[in-house]
Amino acid sequence: MLILISPAKTLDYQSPLATTRYTQPELLDHSQQLIQQARQLSAPQISRLMGISDKLADLNATRFHDWQPHFTPDNARQAILAFKGDVYTGLQAETFNDADFDFAQQHLRMLSGLYGVLRPLDLMQPYRLEMGIRLENPRGKDLYQFWGDIITDKLNEALEAQGDRVVVNLASEEYFKSVKPKKLNAELIKPVFLDEKNGKFKVVSFYAKKARGLMSRFIIENRLTKPEQLTAFDREGYFFDEETSTKDELVFKRYEQ
């Protein structure tokens, strides 16, 4: 079973590390090409392209400039411990033990605009380059064209290595668009998290993101390998709703607190 999650805009390079183990990202040659492209942008261009403040644009222009492909624990950090958004609040990788990291390294992948695909222990230098950004590059008009089949091929390699054919899609639409489902050698399962609001169940972005992290942690902690095991997910008040679920879309609901 391979779990896919999105990266986060918020990064943490200060907190104590839960592990000293690390690996190197596998697609750095491609990342380097994107960095060369991004370095041609001025801070005001970055601000317009990404829709961010001048201060953030300056920070990211500096990050692009400082980025260099020789990653060490001194200039980079394991991806699963560097990302700090809502998904990662639910995941709480900072509390993983060695066996959790082992399972995650085999079964969890983070999709990334700059790095393509990251394993949890892959070192990563700080960046901001969201998958949906229209950064023109030698391969096309945006990052989807840049990555083409590369991300899908890398996921197929991971599936081959672990010997099963199930992908649990816990990534956002923006990021999952970088995967070619028809070329993926796997059964696709998408958990959906609905929260009750004024008597109606709907996707509430903040809660849904955190729930994706909670589900990822649930799979890792319990070493789950079969799709039918996912329906037991019951963290923080969620329950499986068999009636509205299908074989490839598992619906989890939570009553208003």
Swiss-Prot record:
Pfam families: H2O2_YaaD. InterPro entries: YaaA. Coiled coil: none annotated. One of its GO terms (cellular component) is cytosol. It comes from the Bacteria. GO terms for biological process: response to hydroperoxide. Belongs to the UPF0246 family. PANTHER family: PEROXIDE STRESS RESISTANCE PROTEIN YAAA, PEROXIDE STRESS RESPONSE PROTEIN YAAA. This is UPF0246 protein YaaA. It comes from Salmonella schwarzengrund (strain CVM19633). The lineage of its organism: Bacteria, Pseudomonadati, Pseudomonadota, Gammaproteobacteria, Enterobacterales.
